[in-house]
């Protein structure tokens, strides 16, 4: 899960 604007679990 890679979020740019909303990192809710950047793995």
Curated annotation (Swiss-Prot):
Keywords: Cytoplasm, Developmental protein, Nucleus. GO terms for biological process: actin filament organization; morphogenesis of an epithelium. It is found in: Cytoplasm; Nucleus. Disruption phenotype: Simultaneous knockout of tal-1A, tal-2A, tal-3A and tal-AA is embryonic lethal. In embryos chitin secretion and formation of the cuticular exoskeleton appears to be normal. However embryos display a loss of denticle belts and dorsal hairs. Segment-specific epidermal sensory organs are present and segments form normally. The cephalopharyngeal skeleton is lost, and the head skeleton and posterior spiracles are deformed. In the developing leg, tarsal constriction occurs but the tarsal fold does not form. GO terms for cellular component: cytoplasm; nucleus. One of four peptides (tal-1A, tal-2A, tal-3A and tal-AA) produced from a polycistronic gene that function redundantly in several developmental processes. Required in early stages of leg development for the intercalation of the tarsal segments during the mid-third instar stage and later for tarsal joint formation. Promotes the post-translational modification of ovo isoform B (svb) into its active form which in turn initiates trichome development and promotes tarsal joint development. This is Peptide tarsal-less 3A. It comes from Drosophila melanogaster (Fruit fly).
